[in-house]
Amino acid sequence: LDYTIDDMTEASVFEGKKAVYFTLGCKLNFAETSTIGRLLKEMGVRTVRAGERADICVVNTCSVTEVADHKCRQAIHKLVRQHPGAFVVVTGCYAQLKPEQVSAIDGVDLVLGAEQKGDILRYLEERLPLLPAERKLADAEHEAYTVPTKDIHTFVPSCSCGDRTRYFLKVQDGCDYYCTYCTIPYARGRSRNGSIASLVRQAEQAALEGGREIVLTGVNIGDFGKTTGESFLDLVKALDRVEGIARYRISSIEPNLLTEEVLAYCAESRAFMPHFHIPLQSGSDEVLKLMRRRYTTKFFAEKISRVKELIPDAFIGVDVIVGTRGETEECFEEAFEFIRSLDVSQLHVFSYSERPGTMALKIEHSVSPEEKHRRSQRLLELSDAKWEAFYRRYIGTEAEVLLEKSRTEGVMHGFTANYIRVELPVEENLDNQIVRVRLGDFNVDRSALRATLL
């Protein structure tokens, strides 16, 4: 099973149809949606333009929090209203975890779980020719195709272009960690991956299409290699050799899997950028234990110090969950002080959300929504201060920036190797080019540093 077009697939069913795509959640979901889009395009389906009605709606869902579930339902209702009569397919984590809930939503024609989404063309080919009335009859039977978590085995490849400069290459899927707050292992199955040879081919193809930067995505990418007997370090070395790709970023890697060898290689690498995203989740050892995370605060602090020792300019983003069960006021204060002490550049702060079926529900102490909000705000303020301090260190320095067109009139944006966002007056011929600049002060909305070309 693969995201590929079977020779038997009947193109006439798809010819001239228009599709709309809606994605919620992580970079991995966005990569998978655009791969589905590419498949349908090859079958003659084009993306709708503003104001047009679609024949096919594809919704790729997220279920990381209760809010995510709610947003998914809202998005489906909205698309059904905007595109009456369209064939509506829902896939992704919410579809895998709650297929009955999703198929019961008015207007949904087909629900595909994690193991089925790679086969979307076959499912559509069988059902698209049906008249809306016949589809409604099928709807009454709730057409949902999923398998139990233990039977999710397929690695569905995906390399997609988020914009013209940056590609997202899916290297791994699933997770074997079963942290107590998280439903992702149930939604995406066991850890599995593509082969290094197949991933190198996809990177080479991205380079041929003009891609300059690739972000490696997955659920637990440091765990790469379980299915193929390879390692994440082997993958990094192989991708570093692909001609035409100037930059790689590692989307997120567990602290215990960011090994000394991987760090040392990235420090000397041709194309792996000094930019890491490392989930911490809590700065309290007591809470880390309740979460079943695989490290202590001491280990985490040493890892951050080691990154900075080997790669002093590295941008380090850190995930933190606030208000989990068991996070008492004392635990939070301890966590806050620990996080303040870390030399990191930005915090990604999430409020804890109760997920049905997770082990965290057995923990007695719970935190009120108001208290969660207060803790979030304190961490967000800390994040802003760390982010600004990191940017300020580079004002007046020279840097290489990969430029991309901006939605803002008259300017272009891009990122330095160490992920500082940069703003320049627009010059069309510089789109998707790497240029040398001098970094100046903050722009008007303080979202980037102004820069001048050298």
Spans of model-derived segments:
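Proteins enriched for Cys/Gly/acidic motifs involved in redox and nucleic-acid/cofactor modification
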Residues: 1-223, 237, 261, 276, ...
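Terminal RNA-binding accessory module
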Residues: 4, 362-454
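Short, solvent-exposed loop/turn segments at secondary-structure boundaries
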Residues: 68-70, 190-195, 225-230, 290-293, ...
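Conserved SAM/AdoMet-binding glycine-rich loop
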Residues: 88-89, 97-98, 208-330
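Short flexible coil/turn linkers enriched for glycine and charged/polar residues
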Residues: 162-165, 175-176, 272, 282, ...
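Contiguous mid-protein beta-loop-alpha structural module that forms a pocket-lining wall or clamp
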Residues: 327, 342-344
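Short glycine-rich, low-complexity segments
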Residues: 345, 358-362
